[in-house]
């Protein structure tokens, strides 16, 4: 796609990056077939090709409007279109640029500004955990719209204390410790059972995704630099990997190298951090032999059958498909994915469920319909946002897959102890 950049964008990093991405687009429209919002709304401007045209017009000097902003806001940034595109259009990076340019020219109403500010400042804040705890205390009194965002409190269980020669770093995340603390401790226990010690850099915080995708890119980059500083001593001490058990964080940290590529102080470190980053499921191939010796077949068989929802940030953002299901099956678990639309977004998409609740809940209900869990099944996923969003629409338990593996290991140990 040929683009004639307006003079104001010709010599800018954003303009040049966007032009290079647009050059790959051949208008084929394959992306519309796998775009969740196009499937719901049937509007060309609510699909990737239409949004690309809107961004192209802005880059060529056309003044954007609130309608332009709305169509870009409706994008989930699920990146399903990237998996479908035969030309390799880097849509995710393009829409980040497009939103930044449009927001610079289209003021948002004060109400929208307030909500977006509260999200980008509140979710990564140390005050989020006590606020969530308070919400959980009064959860029965909350209206359904708020109750959907406040999960039932859970016990995290004990953190392992054994020392191992093999060590990995893990990002705890900003919302996960407050909303689902068992995910991090279950990760530590499972890796401990496989002979791997989990280390946590206490000064590391939000991965930067919330601010970056809410168009506070400078704020997001500041959080990324702070994380690199927190992790670097562990990297120098030889940490094997930087493990992510939330695929939304993982896809962001894997892009630190790209996002900070022009930062003379952090570019090399950011690239190294990205290369070191692994989704938790990427460790499983090496750990399967040890885990098989730690698991009792009866303990695994006593676990419920599993229905796996692969997050978009895992299957499209990180291009990791099929691994979770295959590895769990190799350990003896009964696991399946939805027969239809397993590739489509559940509607969570970070802060999307707050900013676009109507579309988000339509996608959630559609996803739950295709997952169709039976009475004896549990839904599993690999991202805190997907887990809490899906749980808000079903009585079927929704868990992280590592929690199920941890439960089977615990049952095995209890059986041996008995």
PLM feature segments, named:
Residues 29-33, 43-47, 198-200:
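N-terminal glycine-rich anion-binding loops that anchor highly charged ligand groups
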Residues 17, 63-67, 363:
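Short secondary-structure boundary/capping elements
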Residues 60, 84, 215:
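Short His/Asp/Glu-rich catalytic/ion-coordination signatures at enzyme active sites or charged loops
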Residues 14-15, 91-418:
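Iron-sulfur cluster-binding electron-transfer modules in prokaryotic oxidoreductases
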Residues 19-38, 68-89, 313, 343:
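Cysteine-centered iron-sulfur cluster-binding motifs in ferredoxin-type domains/subunits
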Residues 1-11, 37-70, 88-116, 399-404:
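Non-heme iron-sulfur electron-transfer modules
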Residues 1-28:
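Generic N-terminal leader/targeting and pre-domain segments
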Residues 28, 45-51, 65-68, 74, ...:
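Generic structural signal for well-ordered secondary structure
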């Amino acid at each position: 796609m040929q683009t004639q950049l307006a003079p104001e964008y010709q010599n800018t990093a954003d303009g040049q990056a966007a032009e290079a991405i647009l050059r790959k687009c051949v208008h084929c429209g394959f992306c519309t077939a796998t775009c969740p919002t196009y499937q719901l709304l049937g509007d060309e401007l609510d699909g990737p090709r239409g949004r690309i045209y809107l961004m192209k017009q802005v880059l060529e000097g056309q003044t954007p409007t609130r309608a332009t902003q709305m169509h870009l806001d409706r994008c989930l940034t699920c990146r399903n279109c990237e998996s479908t595109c035969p030309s390799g259009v880097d849509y995710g990076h393009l829409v980040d640029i497009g939103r930044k340019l449009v927001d610079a020219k289209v003021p948002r109403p004060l109400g929208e500004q307030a909500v977006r500010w509260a999200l980008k400042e509140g979710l990564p804040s140390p005050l989020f955990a006590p606020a969530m705890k308070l919400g959980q205390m009064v959860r029965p009194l909350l209206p359904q719209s708020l109750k959907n965002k406040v999960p039932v409190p859970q016990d995290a269980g004990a953190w392992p204390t054994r020392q191992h020669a093999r060590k990995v770093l893990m990002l705890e995340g900003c919302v996960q410790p407050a909303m689902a603390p068992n995910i991090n401790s279950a990760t530590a226990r499972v890796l401990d059972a496989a002979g791997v010690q989990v280390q946590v850099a206490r000064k590391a915080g939000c991965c930067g995704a919330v601010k970056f995708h809410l168009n506070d890119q400078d704020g997001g980059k500041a959080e990324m630099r702070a994380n690199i500083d927190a992790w670097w001593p562990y990297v120098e001490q030889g940490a094997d990997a930087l493990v992510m058990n939330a695929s939304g964080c993982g896809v962001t940290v894997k892009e630190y190298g790209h996002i900070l590529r022009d930062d003379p102080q952090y570019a090399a470190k950011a690239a190294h951090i990205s290369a070191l980053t692994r989704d938790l499921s990427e460790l499983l191939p090496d750990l399967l032999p040890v885990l098989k010796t730690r698991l009792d077949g009866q303990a695994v068989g006593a676990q419920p059958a599993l229905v796996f929802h692969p997050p978009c940030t895992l299957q499209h953002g990180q291009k990791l498909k099929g691994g979770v299901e295959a590895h769990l099956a190799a350990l003896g678990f009964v696991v399946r994915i939805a027969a239809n639309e397993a590739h489509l977004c559940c509607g969570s998409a970070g802060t999307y469920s707050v900013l676009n609740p109507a579309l988000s809940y339509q996608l959630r209900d559609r996803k739950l319909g295709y997952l169709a869990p039976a009475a004896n099944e549990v839904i599993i996923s690999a991202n805190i946002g997907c887990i809490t969003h899906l749980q808000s629409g079903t009585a079927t338990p929704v868990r992280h897959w590592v929690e199920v593996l941890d439960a089977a290991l615990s049952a095995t140990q209890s059986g041996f102890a008995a």
